[in-house]
Amino acid sequence: MRESIHKYLQVGLISFMAYPANMRGADENILDVLKKVACDDYFDAIEVNWIKNPALREQAAKLLRTSHLKVCYGAQPRLLTTGLNACDVNEEGRKAAEDTLMEAIDEAEQLGADGIAFLAGKWAEETKELAYEQLLKTTRNLCAYAKAKAMNVELEVFDYDIAKKSLIGPAPLAAKFAADMRTTCDNFGLMIDLSHIPMTYESPEFVVRTLRPYITHFHVGNTVCQDASAEGYGDEHQRFGFPGGSNDTKEVLEYLRVLKSEGFFNAEKPYVFSFEVKPWQDEDPDVVVANAKRTLNRAWALLED
């Protein structure tokens, strides 16, 4: 494409994946991470997560207000690091997950985000239908609370049998859930991630076309999921070019082609398109981020006008 990617997409970084020290919300150096991203004008958006220290959180909010970045809030770590499950068939467990996600909405508002993203929890075949109803209950309650603040709620589509083993996807089930949600909640949407698509045995074209009416947010990254004995197998979001990875420049280009053909390049109101990349073992986070930019730059250069 001759035109800049920034005309059509808000390129973002999931800060707590690229710099995972804050995954549990307790990184004392979180302001340094946020400043690093805010000072890099490659990025139009930043995705943040919980910051448990109230004083640090207020300083972060001030920094983000100054940055002119689109701020997004990922509530997934609140569930993944605590074992809470938004579709828990035990009502007490479901309510505990809902409570932390309600707190996430408040925190997102303070940080300047216009909503939160979360994921469905683990499931069992014998209680799958009940878990689905529990997830509807949680999500409807979140949407009602967010609606009063003019905020949105997004559910990220994950794998169902490899790593996170989440109730939602694959794509057809995600579409059913989103349709059920949209009957009562117009502030609900779906987030898709290129790194999860190989893990649900689907293609970008199939996923985007199946979920098209409901998609509000995009992630892009890599995964190792073809060989269970391979280093880094599972939902680890390795850098592009990682041995055994499913996604690289070719797959990012295919993803962009599908988004373009399906009308997701919107110059008036661009969608967030964020890198979800994570250092593997002792890799340097800054180099991993540079790798992601380089990969996207090449894919964009190859994309036909």
Regions from the language model: what does each represent?
Residues 1-103, 109, 185-187, 290-305:
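N-terminal pre-domain/capping segments
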Residues 2-3, 87-189:
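Active-site acidic/histidine proton-transfer and metal-coordination neighborhood
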Residues 20-26, 45-60, 124-126, 133, ...:
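Acidic-and-aromatic substrate-binding clefts and catalytic sites of carbohydrate-active enzymes
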Residues 32, 36, 55-66, 99-106, ...:
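Alpha-helical scaffolding segments of alpha/beta enzyme cores, especially the outer helices
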Residues 146-242:
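Acidic/histidine-rich catalytic cores of soluble enzymes
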Residues 202, 244-266:
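A short, acidic, amphipathic alpha-helical segment used as a generic capping/interface helix at domain edges
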Residues 233-240, 268-286:
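Active-site clefts of carbohydrate-active enzymes
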